[in-house]
């Protein structure tokens, strides 16, 4: 029997993940009182002929009982029941935005600020995150991308490295991306904006792509950058990092940075790491 505990930050997607698992024939229970977990594990094993996949949702709503969870999980493991913990994470900025969009109160914020409740929850759940077998940061994931990750881990039994890369193109004229871990300035390349037939196009279109990638400096930059990234990424993983945002900036964020972000994403896709491209400013004038 596969026994998965789904937990993490409120607003990070736990309910969505439980629904995805339920759609994949998991027997799902959300917010089961912590003292009942051992009984639940025993019952699930007893019914394993009929129930082969189980998912249990646990979150901050467990209140004071959450402090007992560590001991309960140790007891479950000591009794011979194997489980996996999936921890769903997201940045404070994204969680605040999600709460504002849904007009819901954070369970720990009371009548105060949402961000204060989020930081308190983050501290209370730190011990669970440290125990997690899988950590997924949903800050930049679309629902379908999250489903792909869940299917890979819990449905198709694929491998998962707890690490996801976003290659983000942007325009310096609109400011630096707040969440970028690494930023590279590609304004040293010839600008397609000043080529009349390319001015109105973007780096997503083949004419601009061909122009940028035909530049000798572009290929040299890509080669050196890939060498550096393939050195850095395993070391980031070794230090416990689970996501990397690589900012690629040009003047307006429409031509050079878009092409190079797409090309870097393509080259990283040939490795074992999960990666996607985002273009922050491509639609801006």
Curated annotation (Swiss-Prot):
SUPFAM superfamilies: P-loop containing nucleoside triphosphate hydrolases. Pfam families: PapZ_C, RapZ-like_N. Displays ATPase and GTPase activities. GTP binds at residues 59-62. ATP binds at residues 8-15. This is Nucleotide-binding protein Cphy_0331. Belongs to the RapZ-like family. PANTHER family: RNASE ADAPTER PROTEIN RAPZ. Keywords: ATP-binding, GTP-binding, Nucleotide-binding. GO terms for molecular function: ATP binding; GTP binding.
């Amino acid at each position: 029997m596969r026994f998965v505990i789904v937990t993490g930050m409120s607003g990070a997607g736990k309910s969505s993940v439980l629904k995805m698992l339920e759609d994949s024939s998991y027997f799902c229970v959300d917010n089961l009182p912590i003292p009942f977990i051992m009984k639940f594990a025993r019952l699930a094993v007893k019914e394993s002929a009929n129930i082969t996949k189980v998912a249990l949702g646990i979150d901050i709503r467990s209140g004071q009982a959450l402090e007992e969870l560590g001991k309960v999980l140790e007891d479950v493991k000591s009794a011979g029941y194997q489980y996996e913990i999936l921890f769903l994470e997201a940045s404070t900025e994204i969680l605040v935005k999600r709460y504002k969009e849904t007009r819901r109160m954070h369970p720990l914020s009371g009548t105060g600020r949402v961000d204060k409740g989020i930081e308190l929850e983050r501290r209370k759940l730190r011990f669970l995150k440290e125990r997690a077998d899988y950590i997924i940061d949903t800050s930049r994931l679309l629902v379908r991308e999250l489903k792909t990750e869940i299917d890979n881990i819990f449905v198709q039994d694929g491998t998962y490295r707890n690490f996801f890369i976003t290659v983000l193109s942007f325009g310096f004229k609109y400011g630096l991306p707040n969440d970028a871990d690494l930023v590279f300035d590609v304004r040293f390349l010839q600008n397609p904006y000043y080529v009349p037939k390319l001015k109105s196009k973007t780096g997503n279109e083949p004419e601009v792509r061909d122009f940028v990638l035909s530049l000798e400096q572009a290929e040299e930059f890509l080669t050196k950058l890939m060498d550096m990234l393939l050195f850095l990424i395993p070391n980031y993983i070794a230090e416990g990092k689970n996501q990397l945002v690589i900012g690629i900036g040009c003047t307006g964020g429409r031509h050079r940075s878009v092409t190079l972000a797409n090309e870097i994403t393509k080259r990283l896709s040939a490795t074992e790491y999960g990666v996607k491209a985002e273009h922050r400013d491509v639609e801006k004038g």
